Amino acid sequence: MSHIKFWRQTLALVILSTLLSACGVNNLPTYDEQVKSSWSQVENQYQRRADLIPNLVSTVKGYAAHEKETLTEVTNARAKVGSIQVSKNLLENPQAMQQFQQAQGELGSALKRLLVVSERYPDLKANQNFLALQSQLEGTENRISVARRDFITATQRYNTEIRTFPGKLWHSFLYSDMKLREAYTATTEDAATAPKVTF
């Protein structure tokens, strides 16, 4: 009799563990790692952009020395981005994340102004080094956009898992230390307003 009881318990345990593994008990840690990984890609692309800036500024400076204000803006924006401590805790701190996003937005705006200024200098636009840097910067901006999109998608998947069944159940029992992630906004406040174009 006890032999049958043992096999029933063993069978119940095997069935229960199979059901648990099939119904999403590991989704939250998996999605959390995807959020962290996708954020690392965003950081990598931001670093790539920051690494291009000194060469770009030096090249423009040689041709447009009297555009000192714009060059200073770009340099200061890069310094501001560099002064923000980026760590794994940035994802856990919405205020620090907001500061980081704002600094990156300011840097992006300063770079756009620099490229607009460069349009006034035909010799600069013909410089092969400048053209190569401009192309690399454009490619990096595209990579940043893709990395942001992937991060937003991973964050949404993670947050949805915490808010819906059965993820909500697993969250309350096993992963209560995992918090909802702050929604990432990759746009500036004025992005919703269409720019005026006049000819």
What are these regions (language model features)?
Residues 2-199:
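A helix-centric hydrophobic-segment signal that preferentially recognizes long
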